[in-house]
UniProtKB/Swiss-Prot annotation:
This protein is one of the early assembly proteins of the 50S ribosomal subunit, although it is not seen to bind rRNA by itself. It is important during the early stages of 50S assembly. Keywords: Ribonucleoprotein, Ribosomal protein. The lineage of its organism: Bacteria, Pseudomonadati, Pseudomonadota, Gammaproteobacteria, Enterobacterales. One of its GO terms (biological process) is negative regulation of translation. This is Large ribosomal subunit protein uL13.
Length: 142
C-alpha cells in the first residue's frame, strides 16, 4: 500500500466561524493554526495546503491570563534608523484588535510560501459582523 498524498485541486475546504469572546489568546490561536494547516483531517499532507477557511469574530473580546494585559509588548520596526515601535496588549486591542489574533496565529504557521497561503485563509473581525455569508460558514466551538 502506498502513502497517500493529497492533491491541492482535490482538497475539500470548509468555512468555519469562531467566536473569540472570552477565549484565551494562545489556546484559541493553537487550534486555529491546527485547522488552517489541516492537521485535523485524515488526508493531511505536510507539503500541501489542506486546511479550512476560518472566520474569527469578536477579536476585541479575546482574553489573556495573568498580567499580560499590561506586560505583553508587541514590537515592530518602521525600517528607518531608530524606528522600533512598541505597543502593549491593551494598546493593540484598542487600536487594531484583529492584529493580536493574526500575530499569534501567524507565528504558529510554517514560514514560507505555504505558510503565507495558509494564513490568507484566516479572516479576523473585531465586531460580530462578517461579509462571508455567501460561503455559509459553520459554527465551530473551540
Amino acid at each position: 500500500m502506498k502513502t497517500f498524498t493529497a492533491k491541492p485541486e482535490t482538497v475539500k475546504r470548509d468555512w468555519y466561524v469562531v467566536d473569540a469572546t472570552g477565549k484565551t489568546l494562545g489556546r484559541l490561536a493553537t487550534e486555529l493554526a491546527r485547522r488552517l494547516r489541516g492537521k485535523h483531517k485524515a488526508e493531511y499532507t505536510p507539503h500541501v495546503d489542506t486546511g479550512d477557511y476560518i472566520i474569527v469574530l469578536n477579536a476585541d473580546k479575546v482574553a489573556v491570563t495573568g498580567n499580560k494585559c499590561t506586560d505583553k509588548v508587541y514590537y515592530h520596526h518602521t525600517g528607518h534608523i531608530g524606528g522600533i515601535k512598541q505597543a502593549t496588549f491593551e494598546e493593540m486591542i484598542a487600536r487594531r484588535p484583529e492584529r493580536v489574533i493574526e500575530i499569534a496565529v501567524k507565528g504558529m504557521l510554517p514560514k514560507g510560501p505555504l505558510g503565507r497561503a495558509m494564513f490568507r485563509k484566516l479572516k479576523v473581525y473585531a465586531g460580530n459582523e462578517h461579509n462571508h455569508a455567501a460561503q455559509q460558514p459553520q459554527v465551530l466551538d473551540i
